């Protein structure tokens, strides 16, 4: 009988030290050394950890592994964006790398599919399959860094920013999200600034309250409507936590946060003649007056079968200017990677086909489910 090996990517620093002490009989500094090899140098072979003694390397090889998602497919956009389909077990998720002059952002998935059924998001077509493990979340960052080129090879950091805006709702996977974020921030991990790690949520108030005081990262909220009636139509989660409940939890989080500097980023997808009228803009401005924020307008990115359209540039411009009349800070997100379906709201692509092929098998095994109303 073969014993399943322990994936060290599933441990943050605290968990790694505990494992080394309890299972390997080793001191904390040895765990720290191994973490540094994994995340600073991208090493996944214990034999290459040259400052680890042979006896410990043999124990690690016998009991442990360093196993990140692998690249099943890579698509390169004309603007430099790269979309990877990354294999996690017998399923795939999508991870997007967005290079700019002053930063390199990685958009990371937290679930296979999504349970929230937002009407304008292509990932919702896939439905929910399962939560990703810690190793599958942080492993996307690890794999992307290897694909782009490690700092020791290129002289620059391969990834400067991480946004949890890929497939899935991060706050419905708190158990695995928090350790993954800890590794992103840890100096022995990727050592990212807390202001450069962003978690986006569609309004899981219980999860946001759980994060408050526990981990400090930048927060973005997917709002997309200025009133409950419209939001419930396009985002069913609003029936569980309405806008006022959501914004109250946002204010609690940013009050305890240094990463957000007192402001939250509000994401608002503009859907042609659905939520982009000037009355909607004025209503949104009034809604957000008591919640310090910057508003990021996202022109809808069409995908096959979607009933929605992108507004005209003139409607986008009028919506932005109306908000600015109320002294809000407003930006319009530049669309990146839309030619490879890597833009906001498009993350599903070929993954949906590969995932559906395993759905029946997963159902037969008793697939993981999330009841949003019960969260």
Swiss-Prot record:
GO biological process, one term: rRNA base methylation
Cofactors, names only: [4Fe-4S] cluster
InterPro entries noted in UniProt: Aldolase_TIM (IPR013785), Methyltransferase_A (IPR040072), RlmN_N (IPR048641), RNA_MTrfase_RlmN (IPR027492), rRNA_lsu_MTrfase_RlmN/Cfr (IPR004383), rSAM (IPR007197)
Protein residues bound to [4Fe-4S] cluster: 114, 118, 121
Cystine pairs: 107-344
Residues in coiled coil: none
Transcription as UniProt keyword: no
Entry EC no(s): 2.1.1.192
Compartments reported by the entry: Cytoplasm
Cofactor binding mode and count: Binds 1 [4Fe-4S] cluster. The cluster is coordinated with 3 cysteines and an exchangeable S-adenosyl-L-methionine.
GO cellular component entries: cytoplasm
Superkingdom of the source species: Bacteria
GO molecular-function term, one example from the UniProt record: rRNA binding
Major localization listed first in the record, in broad terms: cytoplasm
Alphabetized UniProt keyword annotations: 4Fe-4S, Cytoplasm, Disulfide bond, Iron, Iron-sulfur, Metal-binding, Methyltransferase, rRNA processing, S-adenosyl-L-methionine, Transferase, tRNA processing
Domain (Radical SAM core) ranges: 100-339
Active-site residue list: 94 (proton acceptor), 344 (s-methylcysteine intermediate)
PROSITE patterns, alphabetized: RADICAL_SAM
Signal peptide: none
Biological role stated in the UniProt entry: Specifically methylates position 2 of adenine 2503 in 23S rRNA and position 2 of adenine 37 in tRNAs. m2A2503 modification seems to play a crucial role in the proofreading step occurring at the peptidyl transferase center and thus would serve to optimize ribosomal fidelity.
HAMAP family reported in the protein's UniProt record: RNA_methyltr_RlmN
Family per similarity comment: Belongs to the radical SAM superfamily. RlmN family.
Other known facts: Reaction proceeds by a ping-pong mechanism involving intermediate methylation of a conserved cysteine residue.
Name recorded for this polypeptide: Dual-specificity RNA methyltransferase RlmN
Lineage: Bacteria, Pseudomonadati, Pseudomonadota, Gammaproteobacteria, Vibrionales
